[in-house]
Amino acid sequence: TSSMDIKERCPYVYADTECLYDNSLDDCLIRLHNDECDGVITQADILRLYKYNHMKDYIYDYIPTSIYVPETGEAMSAVLTSTDADIIDMVSRVSDENAVKCINIESDTIQRLNVRGYMQMTRAMASIEDDVLRVDACIYNHDKSLHRSNSGDVNSPKTVITNLVSDIISKI
């Protein structure tokens, strides 16, 4: 895990859990890969940085802020695991709806952009505030990059994504 606060709160979230604090998510992922631990708890922002580049073989889900709020008021945390689906199943049942929506929207945006076939790398980040959905996407193609964003009603994610993808496609 990447936060001492998480280590201190971990036993309250999961009964009979022993936590080991580590400053490096890379080291935690190595331990997880080598079956030295059952899961990794980290900040959601850190998870997002690793999501597209380093975590191809891991399952993850978010812990809702209603049961796990660091004193610093930072973003909700996430649990990663490579083998123990029980951890993810448990977290999924209580997961924050907006976090799950954002993950699905990000994945859909990336998939729609990558289907074009000429992007080297595509990244997307969705956020929901009140009733507004904002999706940012950045594509990289050889020596060029393009960043665009689109906002709209949280109840119309397909429209927001379609408009964003159309905008990007028209610019490349």
PLM features: what roles do these ranges have?
Residues 4:
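Early extracytoplasmic/lumenal segment of secretory-pathway proteins
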Residues 7-16, 20-172:
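Small-molecule-sensing regulatory modules
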